[in-house]
Design a protein with these regions (language model features):
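Single, function-defining residue in the core of a domain
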Residues: 1-58, 62, 91, 98-102, ...
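Major-groove recognition helix of helix-turn-helix-like DNA-binding domains
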Residues: 72-91, 101
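A glycine- and small-aliphatic-rich helix-loop capping segment at beta-alpha/alpha-beta transitions
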Residues: 142
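A short glycine/small-residue-enriched secondary-structure motif
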Residues: 58-67, 75-82
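Extended Lys/Arg-rich, glycine-bearing segments that form polyanion-binding/interaction patches
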Residues: 110-111
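Short active-site-adjacent helix-start/loop capping segments
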Residues: 52-55, 67-72, 86, 134-135
Length: 392
């Protein structure tokens, strides 16, 4: 099926054309486009992100140099940077947000049976935010401090497959806890989050009352009393497993039910952590291991920023930046889609890290990664000796 196709066209062939057209038609965009459609824009932006282009001029130069191969990648022509800049400024970023929702509905079921590291029946999600810094002089709309600009990307990640289930883009000045109001909470699901999201009023109303669970870290100034304490095996690192009640003036009213606090010492670093949860059933060690899984959302943010080049933007308006982020998320989901439907054994991290080097090759994608790409420990051969893999 993929014989004779470039790696890039194999990935982009997974785009559901009818659904993409529906997203475009919803915002009545293409009727104004002459020689550069929304599909053309998506392909060019995805190619630029996968190959790490750092400016509009760099994109133009790259496409010009590859002009003889563009047709085989599905790209019509070497689009001038001014044309791309105008499209990024004018075309509604919601097109690509809606398309990301379409892709997620197609991709997520493919990962539903993936094994989670912990043997749990519950769905497990990690929720976190990442601040993306912007130049205040170029992006005055993104001001959040006197001399700084930026936006926040609040993301809920399904840890079976590390897929972004929900993404909210806000000003960097927006408090993290307010993003909880946008979440759809699934009964019985477990939500992992850092202590920046500890708002007992919200945790009780949005999660506990909906029969879902949370695991977070207790703040140092939390006021509470111990109701009971369970026996623990301290050789596992668990120091204590306590039932507590909040005693703060407001917190005692906001969250009147008992909570569970598991205190854990990491022997490797000698650091002590206090984990807070409303789950009374799982073993104390499972609670601490669950919180460790929250770092998967950090890996997702690192991937999005480094491997899809969100650290360099191709426009300065709010629309252009939001558009680039959503196309990056769509590209991530297409890679996740390709991994499953093309039966690729390598991790998404390995695929994304290396695929940009081979986009114009005509090797079947699954052959490239299942036979040629080594493991994480031995993949240095893919990079020129002048560079370290950490630079990419």
């Amino acid at each position: 099926m993929n014989k004779g196709k470039t790696i890039f066209s194999q990935i982009m062939s997974l785009i559901p054309e009818r659904d993409f057209k529906t997203c475009v038609d919803r915002y009545k965009v293409n009727y104004r486009a002459r020689n550069f459609s929304c599909k053309d824009q998506f392909l060019v932006m995805s190619y630029a992100q996968l190959t790490g282009r750092d400016s509009l001029r760099d994109i133009e130069n790259c496409l010009t140099a590859l002009s003889s191969k563009l047709y085989h990648c599905g790209i019509s022509y070497a689009v001038p940077r001014n044309t791309l800049a105008k499209a990024n400024e004018k075309r509604d970023w919601h097109i690509y947000k809606d398309f990301a929702d379409v892709l997620l509905k197609k991709v997520r079921p493919l990962y539903a049976k993936d094994k989670f590291r912990l043997d749990l029946d519950n769905m497990v999600y990690a929720f976190d935010s990442s601040t993306i810094s912007l130049c205040l002089k170029l992006c005055p709309w993104a001001k959040f401090r006197k001399n700084k600009g930026g936006i926040k990307m609040h993301t809920l990640v399904d840890l079976r497959g590390n897929l972004p289930v929900s993404v909210y883009l806000t000003s960097a000045s927006v408090n993290d806890v307010k993003a909880l109001d946008n979440l759809y909470i699934e009964p019985s699901a477990i939500y992992l989050m850092d202590r920046g999201y500890v708002d007992f009023n919200r945790l009780f109303k949005l999660i506990t009352k909906k029969n879902a669970f949370f695991v977070t870290r207790a703040k140092d100034n939390m006021l509470f009393e111990v109701v009971s304490e369970a026996e623990v095996d301290k050789s596992t690192g668990i120091i204590s497993d306590e039932r507590i009640k909040l005693t703060g003036l407001h917190t005692a009213k906001w969250y009147s039910e008992e909570l569970r606090m598991v205190t854990y010492e990491d022997y490797a670093t000698n650091k002590v952590y206090r984990f807070l949860t409303n789950n009374m059933e799982y073993e104390a060690l499972t609670i601490s291991e669950l919180y460790r899984e929250r770092w998967n959302v950090e890996l997702y943010f690192k991937w999005i920023k480094q491997h899809l080049h969100i650290k360099s933007f191709y426009g300065t308006s709010e629309n252009a930046i939001y558009l680039q982020i959503w196309i990056a998320i769509c590209t991530y989901l297409l890679l996740a889609y390709a991994k499953k439907v093309m039966h690729i054994d390598q991790s998404l991290h390995t695929i994304s890290k290396n695929v940009g080097l081979f986009l114009t090759d005509k090797t079947p994608l699954n052959d490239l990664f299942n036979k040629a790409v080594p493991t994480e420990e031995t993949e240095d051969w893919l990079y020129p000796s002048l560079f370290s893999p950490d630079d990419f």
